[in-house]
């Protein structure tokens, strides 16, 4: 197991995952440099060369995550999701640092050729739909080509459940209201509580796993409709207010996979503890007041 003497370097520290990862690392008293995307533009190769040093463990949380916006901003999406990670990988390889690159379930399309869907393994064939998905897969490929010892971690349906714009946060607010809420029932995946994901990434950093593509998501599979009803139940609202509809009733610029649940089997085989079941994680996320799940955007003190 790798020691805690290594400096943890977090990119995208102002985002949903990056801010929670930074907060968790601070609570654990780790030596850390956490920089927001405004402080560190990962599309600038000189920045990576300047910041990353020998022995660092870099966790790349920086990403262009506007799935629909990527359809009209392809160049930006590829710059942040593919070229930027490549710069990080090259810098890590050059100085002798480690790299954990966060990717997405969007690299899969849910087509099992008529067979019964089952959670995707890291070795399953990818088939990204849309600009965002293609840019994230390109990032994975660029990272591993530049630095084969890097670790790529795919996750899915990440949420805080707080005051933000993630699915659970939105459903939580709707549960407090009245009337019917229509939610698609033909998109199935692995909801992942951001706090659990942050802890999983730190465990991976400590384990020193290299040169692998792994999946890290809360256990279990559910549709968006089922997830929404679970949110209502946890909030004490009537789950019958949530009604199933098809994705065709909510057309979006970018396509969504019909099924993108992720298997944790390889995560466990790597000696890591799989994340708990999604329903247990959801209960934890919703047990606290909504505003308490939002991270203070002022980053904890870090040192160069």
Swiss-Prot record:
Binding site for NADPH: 16-17, 41-42, 63-65, 132, 136
InterPro entries: dTDP_dehydrorham_reduct, NAD(P)-bd_dom_sf, RmlD-like-bd
Signal peptide stretch: none
Amino-acid positions noted as binding dTDP-beta-L-rhamnose in the UniProt annotation, renumbered to this chain: 104-105, 157
Cofactor, how bound (note): Binds 1 Mg(2+) ion per monomer.
One CC-aspect GO term: cytosol
Organism domain of life: Bacteria
GO molecular function, one term: dTDP-4-dehydrorhamnose reductase activity
Pfam families, alphabetized: RmlD_sub_bind (PF04321)
Gene3D superfamilies in alphabetical order: NAD(P)-binding Rossmann-like Domain, UDP-galactose 4-epimerase, domain 1
Catalytic activity: dTDP-beta-L-rhamnose + NADP(+) = dTDP-4-dehydro-beta-L-rhamnose + NADPH + H(+)
Biological or metabolic pathway of the protein: Carbohydrate biosynthesis; dTDP-L-rhamnose biosynthesis
Disulfide-linked positions: none
Site positions for Could provide a fine-tuning to achieve optimal pKa matching between active site and substrate: 104
Cofactor(s) of this protein: Mg(2+)
Function: Involved in the biosynthesis of the dTDP-L-rhamnose which is a component of the critical linker, D-N-acetylglucosamine-L-rhamnose disaccharide, which connects the galactan region of arabinogalactan to peptidoglycan via a phosphodiester linkage. Catalyzes the reduction of dTDP-6-deoxy-L-lyxo-4-hexulose to yield dTDP-L-rhamnose.
Extra information: Was identified as a high-confidence drug target.
PANTHER family: DTDP-4-DEHYDRORHAMNOSE REDUCTASE, METHIONINE ADENOSYLTRANSFERASE 2 SUBUNIT BETA
Name of the protein: dTDP-4-dehydrorhamnose reductase
């Amino acid at each position: 197991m790798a020691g805690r003497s290594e400096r943890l370097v977090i990119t995208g520290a102002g985002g949903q995952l990056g801010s929670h990862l930074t907060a968790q690392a601070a609570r654990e008293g780790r030596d850390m440099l956490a920089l927001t995307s405004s402080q560190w533009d990962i599309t600038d190769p000189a920045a990576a060369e300047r910041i990353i040093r020998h022995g660092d463990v870099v966790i790349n949380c920086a990403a262009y995550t506007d799935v629909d916006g990527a359809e009209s901003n392809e160049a930006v999406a590829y710059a942040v999701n593919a070229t930027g990670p490549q710069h990080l990988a090259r810098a890590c390889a050059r100085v002798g640092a480690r790299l954990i690159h966060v990717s997405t379930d969007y690299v899969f399309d849910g087509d099992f050729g008529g067979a019964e869907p089952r959670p995707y393994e890291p070795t399953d064939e990818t088939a990204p739909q849309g600009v965002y998905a293609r840019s994230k897969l390109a990032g994975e490929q660029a990272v591993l080509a530049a630095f084969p010892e890097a670790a790529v971690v795919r996750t899915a349906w990440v949420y805080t459940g707080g005051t933000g714009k993630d699915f659970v946060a939105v459903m939580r607010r709707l549960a407090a209201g009245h009337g019917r809420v229509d939610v698609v029932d033909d998109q199935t995946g692995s909801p992942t509580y951001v706090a659990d994901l942050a802890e999983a990434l730190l465990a991976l950093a400590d384990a020193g796993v290299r040169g692998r593509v792994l999946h890290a998501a809360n256990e279990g599979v559910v549709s968006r409709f089922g997830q929404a009803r679970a949110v209502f139940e946890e909030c004490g609202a009537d789950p019958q207010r949530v009604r199933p509809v098809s994705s065709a009733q909510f057309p979006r610029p970018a396509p969504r996979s019909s099924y993108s649940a992720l298997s944790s089997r390889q995560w466990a085989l790597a000696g890591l503890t799989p994340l708990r079941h999604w329903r247990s994680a959801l209960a934890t996320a919703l047990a606290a007041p909504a505003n308490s799940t939002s991270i203070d955007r002022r980053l904890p003190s870090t040192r160069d």
